[in-house]
Amino acid sequence: MGCIMSQEDEAAKRRSKKIDRLLKEDGENSMRTIKLLLLGAGESGKSTILKQMRIIHDVGYTTEERKVFRGVVYGNIILSLNAIIHAMEQLKISFTTLDHESDARKLLMFSTTGEEDELPEELVVLMKSVWSDSGIQKALERSREYQLNDSAGYYLSQLDRICAPNYIPTQDDILRTRIKTTGIVETQFVYKDRLFLVFDVGGQRSERKKWIHCFEDVTALIFCVALSEYDMVLVEDCQTNRMRESLKLFDSICNNKWFVETSIILFLNKKDLFEEKIVRSPLTHCFPEYTGANNYEEASAYIQQQFEDMNKRTTGEKNQEIYTQFTCATDTNNIRFVFDAVTDIIIRDNLRTCGLY
């Protein structure tokens, strides 16, 4: 372990020195630094993309850092199970056995959040018992009708592995953890001989007033939209359609005076969840006027057009382009491929702004 840790530390030191060198050089050549904002409504996948940047372009997560996420994974599972249990009454779904119903009541009263380093054995037994009930799984399938983390099904289907002694979260486990972003989270990395300063800002309504402090000298912004949330409502008010809220927010961002010269990339995220959902939940939940087929190709193209139509930016007589990518933030290979293409766009637009392209 000592050898592994020293190699990880050495890699981190080398990257840190390279970042320090580029920061020093940046005083002479500002084009070497790319300031990138991640914007979007809450739960659109911004924080997951930021984690991917660390995995792809930095040292990733050491064994010790992965252990720290154990409590977060446990907490996410317990919150998800509690949410499903509470939703069953609202959805009029019954437990299949009285024992499972009794265990569910015990689980709700258990005095832990799960954010400890180990799960009590009694809690593990209750969680597995409750998850085995077909009523719980029916309620999970109807998660659009209440508030539930996207990761719930992923974690619950792997309870045996996650609840095993000495469990250490995998990279995929970490990518799916849900921690509400408050304030501004920054990460730095070097890619294609550029220093990237990436800022993830909270997406909930209460957090958006903090965005203004990031607007100065922005090279590019990535606006994230969760495709799969077209039939869901906001956590904040339980009435407003989430995609309608994202459209309104995107309108205010892409046509903002701060971003007239800024490269804007639209990430239509959670395409995997959208592809599963669209065949059983029509797009008319969000767009009553939609007359196309409820399949991935037509429905995703329609959503893309709705967002791109919001763009009113012009420079002189020329419309400023929006660059759209369909993404799955939990798929490292997809994000690696997409970010490579996006980086070329950002560098090209930055050179053009400086009159060098």
Swiss-Prot record:
Subunit description:
G proteins are composed of 3 units; alpha, beta and gamma. The alpha chain contains the guanine nucleotide binding site.
Q: Where is this region: G5 motif?
A: 327-332
Q: Where is this region: G3 motif?
A: 196-205
Q: Region G2 motif: which residues? A: 173-181
* Region of interest called G4 motif, as start-end residue ranges on this chain: 265-272
Family, similarity comment = Belongs to the G-alpha family.
Q: Which GO terms describe its molecular function?
A: G protein-coupled receptor binding; G-protein beta/gamma-subunit complex binding; GDP binding; GTP binding; GTPase activity; metal ion binding
Q: Which residues form the G-alpha domain?
A: 32-357
Q: Does the keyword Metal-binding apply?
A: yes
Query: Could you tell me which SMART domains the record lists for this protein?
Result: G_alpha
One BP annotation, GO: establishment of mitotic spindle orientation
Protein name as annotated: Guanine nucleotide-binding protein alpha-16 subunit
Task: Indicate which residues the UniProt annotation says bind Mg(2+).
Answer: 47, 181
Reading the lineage from the top rank, the first entry is Eukaryota
> PROSITE patterns under this entry?
G_ALPHA
Binding sites annotated in the UniProt record for GTP: 40-47, 175-181, 200-204, 269-272, 329
Query: What CDD domains does the record tag this protein with?
Result: G-alpha (cd00066)
This protein's UniProt keywords = Cell cycle, Cell division, GTP-binding, Lipoprotein, Magnesium, Metal-binding, Mitosis, Myristate, Nucleotide-binding, Palmitate, Transducer
Q: Does the keyword Nucleotide-binding apply?
A: yes
A GO-annotated cellular component: cell cortex
Q: Where is this region: G1 motif?
A: 35-48
Knockout phenotype, as recorded, reads: Simultaneous RNAi-mediated knockdown of both gpa-16 and goa-1 causes, in the one-cell embryo, a lack of nuclear rocking movements from prophase to metaphase and symmetric spindle elongation without transversal oscillations of the poles during anaphase. At the 2-cell stage embryo, nuclei are mispositioned and fail to exhibit nuclear rotation. In addition, causes a loss of gpr-1/2 cortical localization in 2-cell and 4-cell stage embryos.
